[in-house]
Amino acid sequence: MTQEERIAKLNELYKQAASLNEEFPAQLMEKLSIYGQILELLGGMWAAATKDWKLAEAKRRETIATVYSLDPEGTTKDREMKGEMAAAEWRRKEAEYEAEALRWKAAYVATQEQIQILKKKYEHMKEVAKGGI
């Protein structure tokens, strides 16, 4: 499944979840199930973004090492600077991919929290139905 397909599926699942009334236990349970599916997709997006981030980091390090080792001219500091300049594009990509990974991680954690809130709400409903508080 491509990223665009995953995002479309996420949007569809969020719409389904939003259409359910949390005041009815059956719909609340259905919403929990949908949030579980959302969590699974978010985990995949987080993993894919983390992979892109780490691959960009590896490419940046490889570029620096290659330039440093293949250019014997200049001082050590000059060679390091040349390596960093050659790897500047990879450093930018690394930052973009890191931001994307953190975005998906935040969405994942927020969804976990939402699931916990819904579970507490369901438990409260059960207690009220039994005559408790």
Segments predicted by a language model, with ranges:
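Short, charge-rich amphipathic alpha-helices with coiled-coil/heptad character
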Residues: 11-42
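Extended assembly-interface/linker segments at domain junctions
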Residues: 1-5, 9
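Generic structural signal of hydrophobic/aromatic residues within well-ordered alpha-helices
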Residues: 10-17, 28, 64, 77, ...
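Short, well-structured hydrophobic secondary-structure segments
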Residues: 30-65
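Short acidic DE-rich linear segments
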Residues: 1, 127-133
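Extended, amphipathic alpha-helical coiled-coil scaffold segments used for oligomerization/tethering
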Residues: 54-96
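Long amphipathic alpha-helical coiled-coil segments
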Residues: 62, 92-125
